[in-house]
Amino acid sequence: MSAFLPPIPTPSPDQVRKYLARWREGDNEKIDAALQIVFHAMPRNDDLGEVGVKVAALNGLYSTNIFGVVQVARHIIALDIDAILADNIVVPDLVERIANVDFGGKRRRNYSFATKYCNFHRPDVYPIYDSLVVGVLSALLKQGEKFDTFTPGEHWGTDYAIWHRSISRFRTHYGLDEYSMRDLDKYLWMVGKERKGMFAGPVPASGGSPRVV
């Protein structure tokens, strides 16, 4: 975020409601609804065709840079993740195991994709990690907001447990318990999209095209 951008308003229920209303007005809501239909219709992760469709749909609509859909689908099936996803407690290691895929002897870490894949199965448990949301949270911390504190070596992008902790503390700190993890993701993403658009003209109510991270 640029030093020339105005401060982000302190998060509050009113702020969240405002940005969620903008989200619902635009195309992102329709894309989310379509993906939810896909994931709800195929909740299990033990069939190559079904997992492949979910990987391809998520990758195509959210530009998650998955280059080997079938290979990633086989990788997910081999992890046997359904029992873990059924649990109501976040398992950070699940995100890491989905994220780390071997391609021709080289390991690729599809971190943002893995958080989205878990989120579309369990939006109440697994918050999405992406660059716009990171930018907003980082800007708030630089503004002096105190929703979380960190010890040396803790990083959102390398440890999903830290990311989940920060989102959870963010919700509690600002009195946003009425909103789901997914609602907070939409709010933060819309704030980030708006700030990014301040250098490229007004951001439409739709929030623009599907997120690219």
Regions found by a protein language model. Give the residues of each.
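An N-terminal alpha-helical hairpin/helix-loop-helix interaction module that forms a charged
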Residues: M1-K106, P123-V213
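Short hydrophobic alpha-helical segments that form membrane-spanning helices or hydrophobic packing faces
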Residues: F113-N119
